[in-house]
UniProtKB/Swiss-Prot annotation:
Keywords: Cytoplasm, Methylation, Protein biosynthesis. Methylated by PrmC. Methylation increases the termination efficiency of RF1. Residues 284-312 are annotated as: Disordered. The keyword Cytoplasm applies. This is Peptide chain release factor 1. Peptide chain release factor 1 directs the termination of translation in response to the peptide chain termination codons UAG and UAA. Belongs to the prokaryotic/mitochondrial release factor family. The modification N5-methylglutamine is found at Q235. GO terms for molecular function: translation release factor activity, codon specific. GO terms for cellular component: cytoplasm.
């Protein structure tokens, strides 16, 4: 391993020890903001420090074991142990490289998840409902909380559009690769001839930014409309104009929120979603420039990018970005999507490592 990397790891180890001492000081314990910040930083360093300690132990073990090579009775055992330790060192170094990759500061945030029915009429709306259930069950398995902000139900079931906020630890980091076009191939319940139809939905995932990171929005750039909240079939479920629609005039971005009875609360939530969308649009613009020069698993920002196909007759799900196919469609639609999410994260980390190698 390079001396520069070892030096960085030593610095992180020292910081970890420093934080451990700070967390035991009464002045820090009594300051909740400081205690939370230090605890979070300490937890973030835990894995890399443990892995580095293991790497150090393995290297020391090889040095000590090499002393046994001169002993005829111990030579064979010593050679085997050295070989095993070298293999473990290689694994530890690969793990350390991944742990040292630059972290996306947004990964720890809550996320806004938007699902919109695309081509396919009623069937696309039904599939949007299926995707919402899939993500809700996945969130439940992670002990995250799902809060519906706006839902426009379709007549045959499902949704024309649904926007939710997912609250929990590391939500955006886990869900950010879900953005893009999701396609379904199946025989709709309304199809009498038994023909397979193809429908599509788009999914967008955005981090919920803290107030100090939100882009500045000029109030004069906003058009705010209020209307009565409506339920399935369009019937009004509220006698006051509590639902809010905000249009950001310069970008044309429109956000609606009607889940609260209070217009003030709906407006605050809609403004938060709007800020995240504006920030995301800027990130997507930068991602497009990146995608022009190299592969970008986060997508170019074009929500029509087809990222995944759910084929019901064959019981398979295919992720087109990494050519991954799994034949457990029922499990996937019941929220078991880690086997789709983790390979994408691993591939993204490999791309980052390749980029760092090129720079070095």
């Amino acid at each position: 391993m390079k001396a520069s990397i070892i030096s960085k790891l030593e610095s992180l180890k020292e910081r970890h020890e420093e934080l451990e001492a700070l967390l035991g000081e009464p002045s820090v314990i009594n300051d909740q903001d400081k205690f939370r910040a230090y605890s979070k930083e300490y937890a973030q360093l835990e894995d890399v420090v443990k892995c580095f300690a293991r790497w150090n132990w393995l290297n020391n073990n090889i040095e000590e074991t090499q002393l046994l090579l001169d002993d005829p009775d111990m030579k064979e055992m010593a050679e085997l142990e050295i070989e095993e330790s070298k293999a473990e060192i290689e694994n530890a170094e690969q793990q350390l490289q991944i742990l040292l990759l630059p972290k996306d500061p947004n990964d720890e945030y809550n996320a806004y998840l938007e699902i919109r029915a695309g081509t396919g009429g009623d069937e696309a709306g039904i599939f949007a409902g299926d995707l919402f259930r899939m993500y809700s069950r996945y969130a439940e398995s992670k002990r995250w909380r799902v809060e519906v902000l706006n839902a426009n139900e379709s007549e045959q079931g499902g949704y024309k559009e649904i926007i939710v906020k997912v609250n929990g630890e590391g939500v955006y980091g886990q869900l950010k690769f879900e953005s893009g076009g999701h396609r379904v191939q199946r025989v709709p319940k309304t199809e009498s001839q038994g023909r397979i139809h193809t429908s599509a939905c788009t999914v967008a995932v955005m981090p919920e930014l803290p107030e100090n990171e939100m882009p500045e929005i000029n109030p004069s750039d906003l058009r705010i409309d209020t209307y009565r909240s409506s339920g399935a079939g369009g019937q009004h479920v509220n006698t006051t104009d509590s639902a809010v629609r905000i249009t950001h005039i310069p970008t044309g971005i429109v956000v609606e929120c009607q889940d609260e009875r209070s217009q003030h609360k709906n407006k605050a939530k809609a403004l938060s979603v709007l800020a995240s969308r504006i920030a995301q649009a800027e990130q997507e613009r930068q991602a497009q420039a990146q995608a022009d020069t190299r592969r970008n698993l986060l997508g170019s920002g074009d929500r029509s990018d087809k990222i995944r196909t759910y084929n019901y007759p064959q019981g398979r799900v295919t992720d087109h970005r990494i050519n991954l196919t799994v034949y457990r469609l029922d499990e996937v639609m019941n929220g078991k999507i880690d086997e789709l999410i983790q390979p994408i994260i691993t591939e993204y980390q490999a791309d980052q490592l390749a980029m760092l190698s090129e720079q070095n």
